[in-house]
Regions:
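Intrinsically disordered, charged low-complexity linkers and terminal tails
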Residues: 1-85
C-alpha cells in the first residue's frame, strides 16, 4: 500500500479493533481513544506521511515507544498488519 491509498482509507474513517475512532478533518488525522479518558489526538498529513514511511524501517514496539501507539493501532488496522499492542 502506498501513502495515497493509505490516506484515502483514513478519509473513510473507522474504528480499530481496540475501539479507537479515526477520521480525517482537513489535513489532519484525528484519533479518539476508547479508554476511560477518551483522549483525542491529531497529527498533520505531513506527520502521517513521515510515520507511514518510518514504520516499515523499525519494529512495531520500537515505533510505538518512540512515536505513537495510537497511530500504530490505526496503521495496523488500515494496512492489515497484526496489531501487537
Amino acid at each position: 500500500m502506498n501513502f495515497d491509498s493509505f490516506w484515502r482509507q483514513l478519509q473513510i474513517g473507522g474504528h480499530t479493533p481496540k475501539g479507537d475512532r479515526y477520521r480525517i478533518d482537513g489535513d489532519r488525522l484525528h484519533i479518539q481513544t476508547s479508554g476511560s479518558r477518551n483522549e483525542k489526538y491529531h497529527i498533520t498529513r505531513e506527520t502521517v506521511r513521515r510515520y507511514f514511511e518510518e514504520i516499515p524501517q523499525m519494529s512495531g514496539p520500537t515505533f510505538r515507544h518512540r512515536f505513537s501507539n495510537r497511530f500504530y493501532r490505526v496503521y495496523a488496522h488500515v494496512t492489515g498488519e497484526p496489531d501487537r499492542s
